[in-house]
Amino acid sequence: MIDLSGVFIPAVTPYVPGTGEVDLPAMQANLRRWAASPIQGVVLAGTTGEAVLLDEAERVALVHAAREVLPSHVLLTVGTGLESTRATIRLTRAVAEAGAQAVLVQPPAYYKGAMTPEALRDHYRAVADASPVPVIVYQAPLRMSTLDL
C-alpha cells in the first residue's frame, strides 16, 4: 500500500523553446528544487504535465530522468491513461519498469457512448490486474473527458 497523504507536486512538463522537445534537464532542475522541500511525491504526465501532448516514449523518458534526481522516498506517480486498455497497460508497465511507483489512469473518452459502467469497470480491472504498481483512478472532467465516474 502506498501513502497518498502529504503534498504531491503536479509537475509541468517543460519544453525546449522553438523545438517542442521535452526539456529533461529543465525538468530535473525543477525536481531537484521540489525534492529539497518536505514533499510526499511528484506527479508526472498528469493534467498539469501536458499528458495529452506526450507520446509514450516521452513519458518513459520523463520517468527515467526523474528517478535520476529524486530521492527514493519521494513517490513518483505517472499518468498512463490512453484511449485503449492495451495501450494503457503497455505504458503502465513501461513507466513502472522505469521507476514509477504508482500510476494515474483517466477513463478512455473518445468513444463516450461505448463507455458504459461495465466497460469502465472492465477497463480499470484489466489495467489494475496487469499493473505492477498501484493504479489511481483519475479524472479531470473539465480537461480530459466528459465521462462521469
What are these regions, as identified by a protein language model?
Residues 2-147:
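Active-site beta->alpha loop and helix N-cap motifs at the rims of alpha/beta catalytic domains
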